[in-house]
């Protein structure tokens, strides 16, 4: 079998006004680097597929509170992750069995978080049963994780699908999820934030049922879901003058509804697509946490999106996107974006207009999103 080598490197330098401190601190600055080197192959027979891979990932993040005077406050984090993984798929008369294992070692060197390391191992096993001549599929599975600083945890899951007709499928799933605290949650301290080395891992039990319809031209997915979480990690403070402290919230229940539709049609010989999406989310985090919370202030209650992807000329495509969002605390915003793509053989040119009507809004944390902007791009295909 051939051996594949993948490598990548990216670097970004940007102003970080409002990312971590008050937006009034206008000289914040950040630089990030990300590197990846991996070697993989595929070993395959009639019924068995094995995909082994070894990899190394490196990340570097430098933050400066005052760009021209780093001595006032500066963070530098360097992470390295070395690992090996194998994914196996076996097809038999009773269905498809999937198995995977990933073992890695992570090192972090930081002037704020300290020098730390942990060993991680992830293992999963699942089997997909096809029943009733393929109209019913059942996939039970289990995942086991090990972290040297949080030990072993196992979380099972179950997916069930029922094919009502060629166009309609009903599905349901349930499972347990688990997330350990990040190094930032545990150890990060600055002028507005205090980490907590005594945090417990988050745990949640999630359930979802839904329906999928596909007629070729028209597709839609409808789903309702419920998630009961315990030990949810949030940064909270009793008042606006205090620091945020990483804290485990006792329990949070999240319920919601999701609808996505696509309609495809032709004008002359060109494809056109109209898409709509709506998400409703309701949780009781504000009832659980009476203090000021980074998480609850950013919870979206309603989100509506629409997109029109069109083509009227051979080499020109265009998109128009609209998004409306409303948060649990009542604030809302509307954003319009548009783009044009011109394809000429192996070269593509793009022009993208973001936030056309210059809406002032925040998507995460307290970081104001950019005002109206125009981006130009070019892609060359070998």
Ranges and model annotations:
Residues 1, 39-43, 84-90, 123-129, ...:
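Residues on the lipid-exposed face of transmembrane beta-strands in outer-membrane beta-barrel proteins
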Residues 1-81:
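Flexible loop and strand-edge segments within Gram-negative outer membrane beta-barrel domains
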Residues 3-7, 50-54, 95-101, 136-140, ...:
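Transmembrane beta-strands of outer-membrane beta-barrel proteins
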Residues 4-8, 41, 94, 112-229, ...:
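Structural signature of Gram-negative outer-membrane beta-barrels, strongest in the C-terminal barrel
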Residues 9-13, 45, 56-60, 92-94, ...:
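Transmembrane beta-strands of outer-membrane beta-barrel pores
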Residues 21-44, 169, 173-230, 237-266, ...:
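Outer-membrane beta-barrel signature, preferentially recognizing the C-terminal barrel domain
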Residues 98, 131-132, 226-228, 248-326:
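Gram-negative outer-membrane beta-barrel transporters
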Residues 228-230, 315, 338-382:
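C-terminal beta-signal and adjacent terminal beta-strands/loops
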